[in-house]
């Protein structure tokens, strides 16, 4: 019979190949962090990633299988945190792909918005190490309290309870946003250090589920005062209501349905008139296909 340690090692390799991970430190973190510690007492309710995708888009109800064996948690599955509200500890493979895109390094300062109960925040913390620091933010009071308790063993990790979009995380090397937005929050761009990476879901609202959006995970990197952008993965996710502009929903839906958003190369913050390269244009922010070198310089903070 496999021990928990065996299961964690196998799980880390499963996630590695599922998400095509390039970071040995991230793979090791998946093998070290005990998932069961973060999920509350058994029985745990386990669901498949496919069921989760259909559930969050309103196509079908979520189905769970109960288990009391912690070894069952070490697969690429979601685990219910609040069945009534359809809140889960997310799919390990998807989160791994997003965290991998952060290009975390030892000593980095990271911000995780929508940290849930802190499991993936702990994985980030393992990668940056005690020489770095991590701030998690969670709007759900109960989950935030659980995250703070779960992460108390990491002295370099703190948890903010409340709307993460209204919270100033300070200067960061890496930010992971776990809630759908129509655009990058200006403060997040300002707080990125030179070379800093922001990974976030840019989504359009789904008509059957007004609190859920579908779109892309994008990676934004600050280099030379400009913000470079690239596609990471498709996504369906709960929305961050405070970083959604109703005026951007229509152009965003057009850019997504035409697949033009996959060609995004920069986030422009310089004043300019709408142009053919503008995918989603707003005052002070533009998702653009223009090369970053052709955009105006962002002011460092």
Write out the residue ranges for each language-model feature.
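SAM/dcSAM-binding transferase cores
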Residues: 1-11, 202-301
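Residue-level detector of alpha-helical recognition elements and their boundaries
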Residues: 44-45, 113, 203, 247
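Generic hydrophobic alpha-helical segments
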Residues: 36-37, 195, 227
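Class I SAM-dependent transferase core
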Residues: 1-111, 120, 127, 143-145, ...
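Short, intrinsically disordered/low-complexity patches at protein termini
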Residues: 51-52, 134, 252-255
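Conserved nucleotide-cofactor-binding alpha/beta core module
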Residues: 87-214, 218-223
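Alpha-helix boundary/capping detector
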Residues: 37, 41-42, 56-57, 124-125, ...
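Hydrophobic transmembrane alpha-helix bundles
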Residues: 61-66, 79-81, 150-153, 197-203, ...
